[in-house]
């Protein structure tokens, strides 16, 4: 796996699933391929994205700044600086300075990542802030190692939270989660179907599924009524793809 592929993987792991994630993935691909060279426009686009947490925006802003060539005098962005200040905790800043000194001596991506993984997410964010604000300089490989270590810590905590929801025994939470997943799957089907004539059937299935979820929420239904709803939709989507000549593994 190449360095930039690894960075893209880690960064996308902390972005919530949805149309915005696909947009961000495309922006990262363009940046890493050298196709997007307007850092100012890129940062303005990032600043106005909804849903993303300030820290996620800060990390993405840091990645873009490291990767896109820019004029030396280009202004640093406040939304990135605020996100990478370690919540203003002086302890985070102290640890960040210690980490920075270690990273300065490290020139490899994996070496920097290993060192950074022993620090808290707050200290890691503060260290990124030091580098972003030009208070310190490390190799690009070391900076990417720092970014990936931060993303790994964030993704770990998100995974624990996600697992707690998946294994919850509360039937109401499970019911709502199944309906949310079915609704987002239907939306994705509508987007993938496009405007071809063959797409009408897939669009109809997706539309009916969304109407069903709305009705279930409106009238209140038994928690078991949503079982298998998302899987039924995915089977329909796969059947549609087969007819269109697209062979894909099932993504349950």
From Swiss-Prot:
> Which InterPro entries does the record associate with it?
Flu_matrix_M1 (IPR036039), Flu_matrix_M1_C (IPR013188), Flu_matrix_M1_N (IPR001561), Flu_matrix_M1_N_sub1 (IPR015423), Flu_matrix_M1_N_sub2 (IPR015799), INFV_M1 (IPR037533)
Which function does this protein serve?
Plays critical roles in virus replication, from virus entry and uncoating to assembly and budding of the virus particle. M1 binding to ribonucleocapsids (RNPs) in nucleus seems to inhibit viral transcription. Interaction of viral NEP with M1-RNP is thought to promote nuclear export of the complex, which is targeted to the virion assembly site at the apical plasma membrane in polarized epithelial cells. Interactions with NA and HA may bring M1, a non-raft-associated protein, into lipid rafts. Forms a continuous shell on the inner side of the lipid bilayer in virion, where it binds the RNP.
Record keywords: Host nucleus, Membrane, RNA-binding, Viral matrix protein, Virion
One molecular function GO term is: structural constituent of virion
Q: Which gene encodes it?
A: M
**Record flagged with keyword NAD:** no
Q: What miscellaneous comment appears in this entry? A: Most abundant protein in virion. When expressed alone can form virus-like particles in transfected cells.
The cross-references to SMART domains, in alphabetical order and at most eight, read: Flu_M1_C
Subunit and interaction comment: Homodimer and homomultimer. Interacts with NEP. Binds ribonucleocapsid by both interacting with genomic RNA and NP protein. May interact with HA and NA. Cannot bind NP without genomic RNA.
Q: Which HAMAP family match?
A: INFV_M1
Q: Which GO terms describe its biological process?
A: viral budding from plasma membrane
This protein's species is Influenza A virus (strain A/Chile/1/1983 H1N1)
* Protein name from the UniProt record: Matrix protein 1
Q: Mind telling me which GO cellular component terms the entry cites?
A: host cell nucleus; membrane; virion membrane
User: Where is the stretch described as RNP-binding?
Assistant: 165-252
S-S bridge residues: none
List the ranges annotated as motif Nuclear localization signal: 101-105
Per the record, membrane topology reads:
Peripheral membrane protein
Q: Which family does it belong to?
A: Belongs to the influenza viruses Matrix protein M1 family.
Q: What would be one Pfam family of this protein?
A: Flu_M1
Q: Does the keyword RNA-binding apply?
A: yes
């Amino acid at each position: 796996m190449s360095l930039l592929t690894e960075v893209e993987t880690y960064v996308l792991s902390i972005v919530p699933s949805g149309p915005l994630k696909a947009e961000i993935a495309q922006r990262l691909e363009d940046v890493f391929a050298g196709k997007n060279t307007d850092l100012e426009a890129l940062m303005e686009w990032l600043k106005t994205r909804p849903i993303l947490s300030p820290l996620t925006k800060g990390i993405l802003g840091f990645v873009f700044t490291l990767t896109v060539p820019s004029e030396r005098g280009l202004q640093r962005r406040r939304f990135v600086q605020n996100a990478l200040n370690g919540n203003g905790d002086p302890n985070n800043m102290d640890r960040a300075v210690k980490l920075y000194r270690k990273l300065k001596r490290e020139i490899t991506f994996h070496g920097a990542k290993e060192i950074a993984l022993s620090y808290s997410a707050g200290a890691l964010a503060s260290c990124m802030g030091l580098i972003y604000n030009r208070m310190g300089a490390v190799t690009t490989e070391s900076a990417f190692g720092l970014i990936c270590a931060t993303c790994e810590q964030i993704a770990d905590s998100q995974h624990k939270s996600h697992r707690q929801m998946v294994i919850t025994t509360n039937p109401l939470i499970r019911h709502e989660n199944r309906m949310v997943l079915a609704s987002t799957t239907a939306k994705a089907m509508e987007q993938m179907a496009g405007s071809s004539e063959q797409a009408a059937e897939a669009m109809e299935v997706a539309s009916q599924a969304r109407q069903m979820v709305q009705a279930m929420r409106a009238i209140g239904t038994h928690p078991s009524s949503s079982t298998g709803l998302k899987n039924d939709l995915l089977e329909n989507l796969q059947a549609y793809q087969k007819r269109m000549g697209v062979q894909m593994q099932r993504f349950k």
